[in-house]
């Protein structure tokens, strides 16, 4: 459960990210593919070389979904229902991959915003990504 302090940290951090969210999403996907090569199996039709246009475009989709989630912190299941359906029923993404991407998102944000990435912000973002992952995998059960 996200506390009021968590919600403040998440919204504040996302505001600071601003127009870079799509770039960071692409970078986090690059990190995920490089660090956890098994995640590439879901993208056989993509050019998975670092910085490819397809990875950047999908990273922007990830970032846009997270931006939607940030705007609906009190109703993540409602805000992400269609995305949950897509990943569970059509794409059938192994739930562990959400944890791997979440880790890479945290690393990417910490690299770009080291001053703002305090222990409290880190904890809040970790809880947020875990909550999003839980929603995205909720229809697997």
From Swiss-Prot:
Record: residues binding heme b: 87
Modified-residue entries (Phosphoserine), positions? 3, 35, 49, 102, 124, 138
N6-acetyllysine found at: 16
Expression by tissue? Red blood cells.
- One Pfam match, given by its short name, reads Globin
Keyword NAD present in the record's keywords: the answer is: no
Q: Which Gene3D superfamilies match?
A: Globins (1.10.490.10)
Question: Which parts of the sequence carry Phosphothreonine?
Answer: 8, 108, 134, 137
GO CC terms on record? haptoglobin-hemoglobin complex; hemoglobin complex
Record domain Globin: where: 1-141
Task: Report the domain of life of the source organism.
Answer: Eukaryota
Task: Output the InterPro entries linked to this UniProt entry.
Answer: Globin (IPR000971), Globin-like_sf (IPR009050), Globin/Proto (IPR012292), Hemoglobin_a-typ (IPR002338), Hemoglobin_oxygen_transport (IPR050056), Hemoglobin_pi (IPR002339)
Q: Does the keyword Heme apply?
A: yes
Its BP terms in the Gene Ontology are:
cellular oxidant detoxification; hydrogen peroxide catabolic process
One function term, GO molecular function aspect = oxygen binding
Q: Which residues carry this modification: Phosphotyrosine?
A: 24
User: What keywords is this UniProt entry annotated with?
Assistant: Acetylation, Heme, Iron, Metal-binding, Oxygen transport, Phosphoprotein, Transport
Amino-acid positions noted as binding O2 in the UniProt annotation, renumbered to this chain: 58
Q: Any miscellaneous information on file?
A: The sequence shown is one of two non-allelic alpha chains from dog.
Recorded hits in PANTHER family, A to Z, give:
HEMOGLOBIN FAMILY MEMBER (PTHR11442), HEMOGLOBIN SUBUNIT ALPHA (PTHR11442:SF48)
What is known about its subunit structure?
Heterotetramer of two alpha chains and two beta chains.
What is the protein's known function?
Involved in oxygen transport from the lung to the various peripheral tissues.
Q: Which family does it belong to?
A: Belongs to the globin family.
Know the name of this protein?
Hemoglobin subunit alpha
């Amino acid at each position: 459960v996200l506390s009021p302090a968590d919600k403040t940290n998440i919204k504040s951090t996302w505001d600071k990210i601003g127009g870079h969210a799509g770039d960071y999403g692409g970078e986090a996907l690059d990190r995920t593919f490089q660090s956890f090569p098994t995640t590439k199996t879901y993208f056989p039709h993509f050019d998975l070389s670092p910085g490819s246009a397809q990875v950047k475009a999908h990273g922007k989709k990830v970032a846009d979904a997270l931006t939607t989630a940030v705007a609906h912190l009190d109703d993540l299941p409602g805000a992400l229902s269609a995305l949950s359906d897509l990943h569970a029923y059509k794409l059938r993404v192994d739930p562990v991959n959400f944890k791997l991407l979440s880790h890479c998102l945290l690393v990417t944000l910490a690299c770009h915003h080291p001053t703002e990435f305090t222990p409290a912000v880190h904890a809040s973002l970790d809880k947020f990504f875990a909550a999003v992952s839980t929603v995205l995998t909720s229809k697997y059960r």
